[in-house]
């Protein structure tokens, strides 16, 4: 893959931390999304760590940062059936130099792995957050196990799986050498 075709942008003035979530943070994230997509019209996927946070950010984007004449938005919903999934992905089959499609989806969900949107079907992915899983007894057992082997258990139980989700989602945009 030609690295000159890649733009890697990082916004370090926003966060997806649960304790900082709210209307102001959602609006700042929506502004970042607007800034990214204003550079080039086309189809984008925006991945967020949960359905609730996806709703907050998508609502903020659609309300204050979306030119509805030139931008369409769609959202992943919980418990999507096969036809709904196909319809969601089907929206990405066309692209335009004058119009954008923004798909909001959940990081680690059905659209962040195993989909193949080649060429201009998808020109950008925006990952919001690190994908670190919630604390649970299973992950805590993994953390304790790896801590006991002399390595950082938190990295193995939380950081690596989270970053794997981020990399999988980012990989949706580069499917061929021509992308």
Regions found by a protein language model. Give the residues of each.
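ASCE RecA-like P-loop NTPase motor cores
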Residues: 1-179
